[in-house]
């Protein structure tokens, strides 16, 4: 079936003017995830912030209770014993100057990047490469740390980084269509709680204004904001 026809069929029964309770919205999205691959379930939170102002930036990391259903490749910048710890914890790529050279050459074989604090002067050279990809290590979200083993295990185990975009939206994958409705709801609530805890001091008025759930190839379903906590 052509994508256009599939999407048109999937939109049937979805009232685009209605706000659905979270559990009902998740059920509808799962029922409409009919692609041959296991679609990712995504959440978009429209926040009452303007990220152009430093005191309204929202970012953080959350450990989803049921994982993401996706296996992340993790790269670690570390030396010596910390490099050994990273490897033992399951990091896919570990290095120092050699890894910096690889990344500078466009060879990025990881999805999440972690670094020990002493490596940051070196990793800082990669800002133009890693920054636009949202992969620059940052102590605020636990990716610049001496506990490289914990960070690697977290990334592999279902931790999700989130950051508000220019339009004031936080988007994140919260699982797969093959997950049960209950597991998806738990993951979405964990994300919403983490975003709420990350509320910046400069945020005024209603913080979480609009919520939508969708699958990779399916329509968005609007959610009652009050049902996500």
UniProtKB/Swiss-Prot annotation:
One of its GO terms (biological process) is translation. It comes from Rhodopseudomonas palustris (strain BisB5). This is Large ribosomal subunit protein uL1. Pfam families: Ribosomal_L1 (PF00687). The lineage of its organism: Bacteria, Pseudomonadati, Pseudomonadota, Alphaproteobacteria, Hyphomicrobiales. Keywords: Repressor, Ribonucleoprotein, Ribosomal protein, RNA-binding, rRNA-binding, Translation regulation, tRNA-binding. PROSITE patterns: RIBOSOMAL_L1. Binds directly to 23S rRNA. The L1 stalk is quite mobile in the ribosome, and is involved in E site tRNA release. Protein L1 is also a translational repressor protein, it controls the translation of the L11 operon by binding to its mRNA. It comes from the Bacteria. One of its GO terms (cellular component) is cytosolic large ribosomal subunit. InterPro entries: Ribosom_uL1_bac-type (IPR005878), Ribosomal_uL1 (IPR002143), Ribosomal_uL1-like (IPR023674), Ribosomal_uL1/biogenesis (IPR028364), Ribosomal_uL1_3-a/b-sand (IPR016095), Ribosomal_uL1_CS (IPR023673). HAMAP family: Ribosomal_uL1_B.
